[in-house]
């Protein structure tokens, strides 16, 4: 039977929850009256709130092990528990692997893989004290599942995140469920930087079976499901939220002129 979860007494920690996909996830949990805590390097210009529910902000460099440990301890001390963790912080510009320095490549891997492991580690140390019901969701990308020129380090990191998810799900069961979401092309405030003009974005949308780019809300809905009682037997999986992926190139090539 479908269950309508009550998030009013749940504490949700979201990394990178001030913009893009992360902001959509933050707003979704706030709309359900969850206590939302954002971990990010830069404080938003104004407090994020929905229906009078306000997100709390903790400044944190998720690539800094000592800083993460300190902040998670502060969050736990103030809130007594952490029920849900969304590892969303990440991203990378497109650049050919040989045009980037190894310092750059390593920084991308740190942000998109190692930081999620670090935050999960310190949060799980707190979560494991509960008998059950805690959830960690890692935000991955379709780049993890197929070659993407210009995203070697990013794709490797996101692929590693999917594997990390599966391993931690086994290690930390049954008290903590761990899943990942493989996101497709998502339209955010920075889309023009990645995809070019609005005309280019429409062209990209036409390659998707659902004929549109995704929204942060599409990813947020998947997060809500994975942290709900309706997914209580789902762990160690990667849910693909990408509108059907991309239409195979041969379909367009084979179309009669």
Question: Model features per residue range: what roles?
Answer:
Residues 141:
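Residue(s) in the substrate-gating loop at a strand-loop-helix junction
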Residues 18-20:
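Conserved glycine-rich cofactor-binding loop
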Residues 96-109, 204:
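Substrate-binding pocket helix/loop in short-chain dehydrogenase/reductase
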Residues 125, 169-174, 232:
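Alpha-helical segment proximal to the catalytic Tyr-Lys
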Residues 120, 157, 165:
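Active-site helix of classical SDR
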Residues 180, 199-230, 234, 241-243:
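C-terminal helical subdomain
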Residues 2, 146, 224, 235-257:
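Short C-terminal tail/terminal secondary-structure segment
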């Amino acid at each position: 039977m479908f269950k309508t979860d009550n998030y009013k007494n749940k504490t949700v920690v979201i990394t990178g929850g001030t913009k893009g996909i992360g902001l959509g996830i933050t707003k979704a949990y706030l709309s359900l009256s969850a206590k939302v805590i954002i971990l990010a390097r830069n404080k938003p210009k104004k407090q994020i709130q929905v229906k009078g529910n306000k997100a709390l902000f903790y400044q944190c460099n998720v690539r800094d092990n000592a800083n993460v440990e300190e902040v998670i301890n502060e969050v736990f001390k103030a809130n007594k528990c952490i029920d849900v963790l969304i590892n969303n912080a990440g991203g990378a510009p497109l650049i050919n692997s040989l045009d980037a320095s190894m310092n750059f490549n390593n920084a991308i891997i740190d942000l998109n893989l190692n930081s999620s492991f670090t935050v999960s580690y310190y949060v799980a140390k707190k979560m494991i004290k509960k008998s059950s019901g805690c959830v960690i969701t890692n935000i991955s990308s379709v780049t993890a599942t197929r070659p993407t020129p210009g995203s070697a380090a990013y794709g490797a990191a996101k692929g590693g995140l999917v594997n990390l998810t599966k391993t931690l799900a086994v290690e930390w069961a049954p008290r903590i469920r761990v899943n990942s979401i493989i996101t497709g092309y998502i339209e955010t405030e920075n889309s023009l930087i990645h995809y070019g003009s609005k005309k280019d974005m429409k062209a990209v949308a036409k390659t998707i079976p659902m004929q549109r780019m995704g929204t942060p809300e599409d990813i947020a809905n998947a997060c809500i499901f994975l942290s709900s009682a309706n997914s209580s037997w789902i762990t160690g999986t990667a849910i693909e939220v990408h509108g059907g992926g991309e239409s195979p190139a041969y379909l367009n090539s084979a179309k009669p002129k």
